[in-house]
């Protein structure tokens, strides 16, 4: 077996049972990985130097193919209501079959950190079959100094073999695609998919399991910090504006997706960004556009012009989930340390397509826990069915697929941190106003930015608030530069009776969704539900 690159010779591939390999390329950089990927036909170059790849039949994560080992350690610590299980014996069979499948392969190995805070980071070793997968994870996680590689001992090991095909009967899974996590052995096996995001989210899931016991709240969020050191956290599901609103030229970007909140502040789990790039333009998002069109970037499933090799970001023929992976240092105002102080503001973003939520509301710690556990946004049904009625989306803690522990673990931690540090918490509606989708209009981005600026700089602390009759949270009645009517959603509707019906309908959806959390929370959080306010009428 031929091994090249800087590595810990005493802790090589054989420690994990990887034997009879053609070789291992240890910790190669971007130029090497470009060469390997292009030579193997894994991708092509764009005109500006990005590596363009197709991920095959899987153009996104496959949650139904993700499994966690159920053993004596995880029986009582994993949230089995939201995670699929396999036995330790099934995992061992899968592991041995992975090792057998890898024989004769030339693998790539990266030694990386998950987490910018040395006190809480997890040393992660990733073996991949494909060169571009090695480049991807090297870009997304945090790279040690070269000198540290010679003594690197991993705490978490990921083996990603895209050509492996699982056997449902033999391995206890549902299909040939599999992502299996053994928290006890700290091993992740990924097979049957070329979608690189599975690696990144496996590290996130692992940190979500271990960090709460260390007093750190892991979060699916973006974060930035102002010139005075005031940190802000932005929770939000896809399409709510999390990336756009946290990218503020007047504030330093900490990260766009995964963070931890510990006793000393907030830290990024990653060293790169993984941005959706459908309809990406230089005009709307100049920093992301520039970062995506340069050497070192990876473009997933993006259509290239066959002659000019320029990417067509408007072409979603392969998937709407086109992605760009690039190093954080490609963003001009990004923090390279990945660390900031304790948050002063927490923002929960919701694109309310029902048009009944105010553009901004202030939450109590109990209300914050309620809305964090709810994880609400709304999407519009596809026009191919001729339906314009919005449908609610609830993803607990704004990251349900990545939560190995009971949601109340994360919810209680957030509530306690907000109360302990006197953090202001805001719910921001980036969705519709003046009616539901199809009748109303999208909340003006200028209004959202003005309200966010006022929230983050403390201006909203000095205004008058009213209590929303449906949701019970506090809503500002006026703010200089913002039309007062837009702050009270009922005033933007022509049909007031229709507003009442729609608002009550959405409250009912919240109630139905939250019923599964009733037993997890205390009386104060139960009282923070919308139903408590309506029942009092």
From Swiss-Prot:
Binding site for Mn(2+): 201, 220, 257
Key word Cytoplasm present: yes
Catalytic reaction annotation: oxaloacetate + ATP = phosphoenolpyruvate + ADP + CO2
SUPFAM superfamilies, sorted: PEP carboxykinase N-terminal domain, PEP carboxykinase-like
Assigned GO CC terms: cytosol
Cofactors required: Mn(2+)
Gene3D superfamilies registered for this protein in UniProt: 3.90.228.20, Phosphoenolpyruvate Carboxykinase, domain 1, Phosphoenolpyruvate Carboxykinase, domain 2
Cofactor: how and how many bound: Binds 1 Mn(2+) ion per subunit.
Classification via Pfam families: PEPCK_ATP (PF01293)
Coarse class of the protein's main subcellular location: cytoplasm
Keywords, alphabetical: ATP-binding, Cytoplasm, Decarboxylase, Gluconeogenesis, Lyase, Manganese, Metal-binding, Nucleotide-binding
Cystine connections: none
Entry binding sites for substrate: 61, 195, 201, 323
Function: Involved in the gluconeogenesis. Catalyzes the conversion of oxaloacetate (OAA) to phosphoenolpyruvate (PEP) through direct phosphoryl transfer between the nucleoside triphosphate and OAA.
NCBIfam families according to UniProt: pckA, PRK09344.1-2, PRK09344.1-3, PRK09344.1-4
Protein family (similarity comment): Belongs to the phosphoenolpyruvate carboxykinase (ATP) family.
Protein's recorded name: Phosphoenolpyruvate carboxykinase (ATP)
